Amino acid sequence: MESSAKLTSVRLSPRKTRLVVDLVRGKVIQEALNTLRFLPQPSAKLVSKLLQSAVANAEQKGVSDVDALYVKTIYVDGGSVLKRFLPRAMGRASKIRKPTSHISVTLSDSK
């Protein structure tokens, strides 16, 4: 049985978040959570919370053995970009892009 969870409009760069997500793809859920626990990246904490949410969704669906779950698919899509301007010298302005991410995960209990 599969369960999924989504996290939308997270104020993290999709490029940096993909580095963390690639480390847990295909792993058993407990191993993935242990991997994320020791990563220094800010996105690791959010991905960990998302995995725990997907596990809770699986329990709600009636999965009996939660320890047998593994990360079937996990991916990061780019969200909307917040655009800001920074005043510069001589009346000019520089554009500042603040990217957002959408993270989706699917857990499954059968390989």
UniProtKB/Swiss-Prot annotation:
GO terms for biological process: translation. Disulfide bonds: none annotated. Signal peptide: none annotated. Keywords: Ribonucleoprotein, Ribosomal protein, RNA-binding, rRNA-binding. One of its GO terms (molecular function) is rRNA binding. One of its GO terms (cellular component) is cytosolic large ribosomal subunit. Part of the 50S ribosomal subunit. This protein binds specifically to 23S rRNA; its binding is stimulated by other ribosomal proteins, e.g. L4, L17, and L20. It is important during the early stages of 50S assembly. It makes multiple contacts with different domains of the 23S rRNA in the assembled 50S subunit and ribosome. Belongs to the universal ribosomal protein uL22 family. This is Large ribosomal subunit protein uL22. The lineage of its organism: Bacteria, Pseudomonadati, Thermodesulfobacteriota, Desulfuromonadia, Desulfuromonadales.
